[in-house]
Structure formats: structure tokens, C-alpha cells
Regions:
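Conserved, helical-rich catalytic subdomain that frames metal- and/or nucleotide-binding sites
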Residues: 3-99, 114-127, 131, 135-146
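Short hydrophobic/aromatic beta-strand micro-patches
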Residues: 110-112
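Glycine-rich GHKL/ HATPase_c ATP-binding element in histidine kinases
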Residues: 107
Length: 146
């Protein structure tokens, strides 16, 4: 689903390609106001990045293609405040993720994996260092309201 505003505007999208996600919330946190006040926020992202991801989803592209257009405008600002976020992204990639990015304004980081086995293997290794680590996959209908 495409969530806009502060998450209250939800637009269903076509079904997601098959992939698995490992998400980690490190012990450290970031101040949202500090992140948003950083001059490093990449204002060039936004609509173009979102439109590329949505277009890839609508045309049934593979997860690798869908995520190749994903960007987080807050990531550079958050990494400047907490370089460990970059190390956590590297850890995801070293352990088999084909894509990794910070979630929101941080400090959570997720990795995207092409198989349950790859995600499970990474989950075990990463969780041994970061207890707040979880494994999940998108719901097949792209959006479900519970």
C-alpha cells in the first residue's frame, strides 16, 4: 500500500512480488526533530522515487527492480547523527540482503531478501547482536486492514 501524509492516507497497490524482510531496531534512538532539522535531508528525492517504485509494482516487476528505485530522504541526515545505521545496513547486505535501507527517520534498518532461507539465516546472525530483530514478508494482497 502507498501510505501518505502521516500514514493515514492508504492507497492499495497491486500484489507485491515474493520477498522476505528482516528489520532491526537497534538499542539507540534518534530525535525526529534533530533528523528533520538537518541540512543533509535529501530534498531531491520524494515524488520521483515514490513514482518509480509504484510504477515497478504496477507492472509486476521483481522485488530487485522494485527496490532499486527506493530511497529515504532522511537517511543521510540520520547516518550523520548515528553512523551505526550505515554499519547496520552493511550487516544486512553482508548477510544476504539484496537491498537495505533505514526505515522512516531511523533508527530501524531493514534488509530485503529473495528467499525465506536467506532471510532466516541473516535473522539468526543479526538477532544475536541486536535482540529487537524480526522477520516478516508482505501480505499477498498488498494491503490488509486488521
Amino acid at each position: 500500500a502507498l501510505c501518505e501524509g502521516i500514514g493515514e492516507q492508504v492507497t492499495p497497490l497491486s500484489a507485491m512480488p515474493e520477498y522476505w524482510i528482516v528489520i532491526t531496531k537497534p538499542r539507540f534512538s534518534l530525535s525526529t526533530s534533530e533528523v528533520f532539522s538537518s541540512p543533509l535531508i535529501a530534498r531531491a528525492y520524494g515524488a520521483d522515487s515514490t513514482n518509480l517504485v509504484i510504477s515497478s509494482l504496477k507492472s509486476g516487476k521483481s522485488a530487485n527492480v522494485v527496490f532499486s528505485g527506493a530511497q529515504n530522504a532522511l537517511e543521510s541526515a540520520s547516518i550523520s547523527l548515528c553512523p551505526a545505521i550505515a554499519r547496520l545496513k552493511e550487516l544486512m547486505l553482508k548477510n544476504g540482503a539484496f537491498f537495505s535501507m533505514m526505515s522512516g527517520s531511523g533508527s530501524s534498518v531493514y534488509g530485503v531478501f529473495d528467499s525465506h532461507k536467506a532471510a532466516s539465516d541473516a535473522f539468526g546472525l543479526i538477532r544475536s547482536q541486536f535482540p529487537n530483530t524480526y522477520i516478516t514478508k508482505p501480505c499477498p494482497n498488498a494491503v490488509e486492514f486488521i
